[in-house]
Amino acid sequence: MINFSYMRAHDVADAVRQIAADPTAKFIAGGTNLIDLMKENVACPSRLIDITHLPLDKVEKISDGGLRIGALVPNSDLAYHPEIAARYPLLGSAILAGASPQLRNMASTGGNLLQRTRCFYFYDTTTPCNKREPGSGCSAIGGINRMHAILGTSEQCIATHPSDMCVALAALDARVLVTGQGGERTIAFSDFHRLPGDAPQTDSTLRPDEIITAIELPSKGFAGNYTYLKIRDRLSYAFALVSVAVGLEIADGAIKEARLALGGVAHKPWRDRDVEAQLAGAPPTAETFRRAADTLLRDARGFGHNDFKIELARRGIVRALTQAARGTPQSQADKRIA
C-alpha cells in the first residue's frame, strides 16, 4: 500500500469538487473492497475522500410508488428493512446470499455497485491483466478460468462481476441516481455496468467526477413469485459460479410478466429481455423454462476450465424459474448467521 492523504467531504457538492480536482482520488465508505485493492497495490489512490458523513443513509418511498435507497445504506440494514422484506424480498434474499455478516454491516449500497472483479489475475500484479494494466493481455484466457465468464466476453477480458445484490437490482429494473459537475442524472441499471469490449478497465458508465447518491426501485417488486438462487462451491462467503434472480407475475395459468438476471457469468449482471418476452404469455412449465434457458445461453462460450458453467447455468435457470413459479424461493436463512 502506498502513502495517501485523507479528507472528509462535507456534502455531495464538496465530494464532487474534491474528486474532480484529483483524478487519482477515490471515495471511501465501507471500504470492504477498496482497502483490499489498496493492500495489493491494485488500487493506488493519492487521496481518500471519506463520504460516510453525507446524508445518503435513508430508505424512502417515492411518488411513483417505488423506493429510494440512499447510497450509504449498509447492506445489512437494507436486507432487513421492512419495506424490502414486504415488497422486494428478491433484493433482500440476494444481499443475504453474499459476503458475511461482518462485511454486510460495513458495505454500502452504492459501493456494492462499484466493487471490482474477484479475478485472481486482476489481484496478482505479477501477471498480465488488461483490466488492471490495459494492453498487457488477459492471463485468464488460456489460464485458470474456472470462475470466469461465459457470456459477453471479449478477447481482452473474461472476468465476471462479483455482486449478488446487483443481480437482483438488474432483475428489478432499478435506476441509479448520480451527481457530478454536470448536475444530477439517472442511469437505468441495465446501462450502468459495461461489458469488457476493448476497454475492460472501465467497469461502469459512471463518469470520473460523479458520485452515486441513491438507487431507486420501481413499484413492482414481484414479492409473490421470486427467487435468488446462488450456486457456489461452499455455503458461506463464496462468490457465485452461477446465480439466478427471478421475478414472475402469474395469472390465469400463464406468465404475465417475467424478470430474469444472471450473476457469475458475465462482466455485468446479465439480463436478456428477449428471454423475458419469450416467457410472457407462456405456461409456467418445465418445457417453457428449458426453452428459456436454451435461448438465454445461445451465445454462451466456455474457455476450458469453465466449460461446465454453461450446463450449470442452464440447470440453474430452470430450477430458479421453477422455484419462483411455485412460490418457494431459495432460503437464505443460513446466511443470517453464517
Task: List each language-model region with its residue ranges.
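C-terminal structural segment of proteins
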Residues: 1-338
